[in-house]
């Protein structure tokens, strides 16, 4: 069956920690509809696409590409579709995010643009007026994954192991974005290169972004002072901090050694930590929605009112802004007090997140089939492609291992690692050590999917194929 022509769906992953498992859910949904799926790092997916002999299939991305990259992809793929995960439930300004991440000269290249809910659907139709017939109210595969994993979290071995090791704890999910001045400078550089600064509106927007990022850094520093005080408290459960994958982790690394009760943990997926916790404190990221589906008590921490994101995560959470309120929330979690239980906000949810009898993944897969992309045979890499992939992987892993070895040695000596290039650190954090067949199988186990009907194969380094037998 895997040697016949099928629709090929290409799913590039930018960040493994929060993108990978939901994309596997989408991949399995597609495979069940007889679509062959390739999931991997963006570099590996693109290497395959640019080297395949045929032209066909669907490239599924999250936005942010330039016109030259998109045209290059469309020469080798029948369709280019977008579900921009940056326009998530925690985004209080989806208008700006949509316009910033999709340049006007790219609009006509988009065959389908999938959106999270009714609010973003109406906004997208106004912003992308030329292609409004191609805008699909789909929902989000990440929500599909939240729902499925929340139902099965009681059986998770990882969750049980975490609870056994750490007991009762409160999980803080960091989403400051700006945890160092060099991160603020890098963000400024990225926006200044993307925005047309000859326009007054964009100059004003860049100033607003810079001001917001500096406030975020200031708030992060305030939070660190609070953590240092909370670390001395014995009356509350342990607080475990999970830094965001795209934050600068080096300030967190520096702090890690100075705490005794508070833990800063980078390893593994977020889900088992969330499900093992007694409650969640967050900064407005979409993980708040996952906590909501898991019926976990949650609180939105704000130490600067100007930095509050008045989006869905804020509306479904208790609002806290001091050590006293953090302590009270933590103790309430131990007593199972949760004023924001699931289904209390169904109307608010339905505005932001589209839920129907069909999952978001089903809606997207059905739309992909309607596009009628050219079917292709399975990809067979040549020796040269395998060699190039192996060499690139060797260089990447060498840099990753070097990074971690130096960091571990310095940690042992009571010091912390300072990188000369924050973008290099970011690469290690996004997809550390790569994407493997075992990663896919682990997600299938987590979700309780039967593996008997699915073929999972490693194609190249950081590139896996998934299809129906």
Task: Give residue ranges: language-model regions.
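Conserved catalytic-core segment of nucleotide-activated headgroup transferases in glycan assembly
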Residues: 151-254
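Hydrophobic/aromatic beta-strand patches that form the interior of the parallel beta-sheet core
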Residues: 38, 60, 81, 112-114, ...
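Donor nucleotide-activated moiety binding/catalytic core segment of transferases
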Residues: 42, 213, 221-224, 240-289, ...
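A short, flexible N-terminal coil/short beta segment enriched in small residues
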Residues: 1-19, 215, 223-235
């Amino acid at each position: 069956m895997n040697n016949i022509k099928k629709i090929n769906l290409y799913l590039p992953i930018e960040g493994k920690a929060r993108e990978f498992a939901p994309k596997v859910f989408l991949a399995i949904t597609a495979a069940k509809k007889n679509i062959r799926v390739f999931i991997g790092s963006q570099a590996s997916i693109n290497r395959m696409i640019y080297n395949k002999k045929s032209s066909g299939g669907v490239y599924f991305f999250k936005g942010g590409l330039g016109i030259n990259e998109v045209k290059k992809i469309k020469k080798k793929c029948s369709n280019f579709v977008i579900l921009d995960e940056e326009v998530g439930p925690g985004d209080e300004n989806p208008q700006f995010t949509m316009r910033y991440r999709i340049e006007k000269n790219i609009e006509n290249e988009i065959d389908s643009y999938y959106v999270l809910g009714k609010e973003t659907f109406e906004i997208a139709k106004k912003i992308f007026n030329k292609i409004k017939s191609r805008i699909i109210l789909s929902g989000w595969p990440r929500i599909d994954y939240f729902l499925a994993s929340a139902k099965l979290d009681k059986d998770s071995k990882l969750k049980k192991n975490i609870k056994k090791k750490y007991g009762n704890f409160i999980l803080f999910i960091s989403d400051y974005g700006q945890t160092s001045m060099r991160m603020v400078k890098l963000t400024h550089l990225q926006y200044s290169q993307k925005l047309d600064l000859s326009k007054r509106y964009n100059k004003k927007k860049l100033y607003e972004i810079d001001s917001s990022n500096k406030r975020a850094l200031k708030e992060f520093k305030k939070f660190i002072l609070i953590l240092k005080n909370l670390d001395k408290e014995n009356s509350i459960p342990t607080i475990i901090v999970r830094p965001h994958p795209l934050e600068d982790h080096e300030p967190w690394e520096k702090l890690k050694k100075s705490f005794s009760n508070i833990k800063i943990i980078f390893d593994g997926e977020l889900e088992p930590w969330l499900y093992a916790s007694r409650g969640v404190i967050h900064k407005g990221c979409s993980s708040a929605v996952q906590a909501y589906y898991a019926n976990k008590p949650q609180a939105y921490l704000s130490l600067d009112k100007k930095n509050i994101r008045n989006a869905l995560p804020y509306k479904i959470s208790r609002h806290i802004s001091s050590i006293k309120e953090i302590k009270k929330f933590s103790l309430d979690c131990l007593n199972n007090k949760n004023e924001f239980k699931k289904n209390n906000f169904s109307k608010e949810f339905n505005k932001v997140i589209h839920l129907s009898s069909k999952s978001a993944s089903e809606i997207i897969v059905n739309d992909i089939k309607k596009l009628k992309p050219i079917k292709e045979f399975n990809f067979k890499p040549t020796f040269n492609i395998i060699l190039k992939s192996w060499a690139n992987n060797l260089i990447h892993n060498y840099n990753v291992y070097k990074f971690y070895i130096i960091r571990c040695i310095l940690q042992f000596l009571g010091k912390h690692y300072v990188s000369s290039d924050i973008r290099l650190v970011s690469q290690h954090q996004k997809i550390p050590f790569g994407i493997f067949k075992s990663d896919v199988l682990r997600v299938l186990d987590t979700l309780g999917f039967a593996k008997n009907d699915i073929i999972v194969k490693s194609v190249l380094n950081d590139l896996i194929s998934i299809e129906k037998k």
